[in-house]
Amino acid sequence: MSATLKDYLNKRVVIIKVDGECLIASLNGFDKNTNLFITNVFNRISKEFICKAQLLRGSEIALVGLIDAENDDSLAPIDEKKVPMLKDTKNKIENEHVIWEKVYESKTK
């Protein structure tokens, strides 16, 4: 069975963002663009409390997963040396502004 975000409402979730950041939070709302309203947000690796409430754009999200309430060790200590850093999934183009300048010039001629 495939889960939908509505199955995760008002539950603890793990969120992996496209920049590789991993968050633990409670999912309180979402929309058709996968924008998420989350509360009690923690960084998964450093255990640092980030904020009480946050709105994440759907374009920033790579994965949302449910945390098992019975075995919730999401904020248990982690040996950071053993955790591989997640690769950034953003599409980055070097000197992208130069490309867009050429596109603009070609359309204005």
From Swiss-Prot:
PROSITE patterns, sorted: SM (PS52002)
Protein's name in the database: LSM2-LSM8 complex subunit LSM8
Signal peptide stretch: none
Domain Sm stretches: 1-70
Oligomer status and interactors: Component of the heptameric LSM2-LSM8 complex that forms a seven-membered ring structure with a donut shape; an RNA strand can pass through the hole in the center of the ring structure. The LSm subunits are arranged in the order LSM8, LSM2, LSM3, LSM6, LSM5, LSM7 and LSM4. Component of the spliceosome U4/U6-U5 tri-snRNP complex composed of the U4, U6 and U5 snRNAs and at least PRP3, PRP4, PRP6, PRP8, PRP18, PRP31, PRP38, SNU13, SNU23, SNU66, SNU114, SPP381, SMB1, SMD1, SMD2, SMD3, SMX2, SMX3, LSM2, LSM3, LSM4, LSM5, LSM6, LSM7, LSM8, BRR2 and DIB1.
GO terms for MF: mRNA binding
Keyword tRNA processing assigned: yes
PANTHER family, alphabetized: LSM1 (PTHR15588), U6 SNRNA-ASSOCIATED SM-LIKE PROTEIN LSM8 (PTHR15588:SF9)
Superkingdom of source: Eukaryota
InterPro entries: Lsm8, LSM_dom_sf, PTHR15588, Sm, Sm_dom_euk/arc
Any one cellular-component term (Gene Ontology): precatalytic spliceosome
UniProt-annotated location(s): Nucleus; Cytoplasm
Additional detail: Present with 1440 molecules/cell in log phase SD medium.
A biological-process GO annotation: rRNA processing
Functional summary from the UniProt entry: Component of the nuclear LSM2-LSM8 complex, which is involved in spliceosome assembly. The LSM2-LSM8 complex plays a role in the biogenesis of the spliceosomal U4/U6-U5 tri-snRNP complex by accelerating PRP24-mediated annealing of U4/U6 di-snRNA. The LSM2-LSM8 complex binds U6 snRNA terminating with a non-cyclic 3' phosphate group. LSM2-LSM8 is probably also involved in degradation of nuclear pre-mRNA by targeting them for decapping. LSM2-LSM8 could be involved in processing of pre-tRNAs, pre-rRNAs and U3 snoRNA, although involvement may be indirect.
Keyword line: Cytoplasm, mRNA processing, mRNA splicing, Nucleus, Ribonucleoprotein, RNA-binding, rRNA processing, Spliceosome, tRNA processing
Protein family: Belongs to the snRNP Sm proteins family.
Matches recorded under Gene3D superfamilies: 2.30.30.100
